[in-house]
Amino acid sequence: MAQQKSAAAASQRARKKVKKNVADGIAHVHTSFNNTIITITDRQGNALSWATSGGQGFKGSRKSTPFAAQVAAEVAGKTAIECGIKSLEAQIKGPGPGRESAVRALNSLGIKITEIQDVTPVPHNGCRPPKRRRI
């Protein structure tokens, strides 16, 4: 009985990821003042690849640099190219410093950027913003 469970568990773990073959998709670039998250999805919103600045080994204040966003975009883009991505629509959200460099990095990989949208949410006088920094 115990062997049957372990054999079933082993076959479940050994199941290989199915590579999707998608020609075009959407690059969701979420930039904050602390980190940059890049998710590449198909048109339906199913994630094909993703990467973050912190996941690429950048820690602390270096996560929020344009270079860290560029490295994360290259990692996500290479995985997306393996899935067959040829062109992307970029949706950029947030005020961070890695906005432009992430899109440039995807373009330099040979992925055609067809459209760039700014989908940063703007409050209609909602929550009170954080107080100004005094240095």
UniProtKB/Swiss-Prot annotation:
Transmembrane segments: none annotated. Keywords: Ribonucleoprotein, Ribosomal protein, RNA-binding, rRNA-binding. The keyword Ribosomal protein applies. The keyword Transmembrane does not apply. One of its GO terms (molecular function) is structural constituent of ribosome. It holds the Pfam family Ribosomal_S11. InterPro entries: Ribosomal_uS11, Ribosomal_uS11_bac-type, Ribosomal_uS11_CS, Ribosomal_uS11_sf. It comes from the Bacteria. Part of the 30S ribosomal subunit. Interacts with proteins S7 and S18. Binds to IF-3. Belongs to the universal ribosomal protein uS11 family. This is Small ribosomal subunit protein uS11. It comes from Polynucleobacter necessarius subsp. necessarius (strain STIR1).
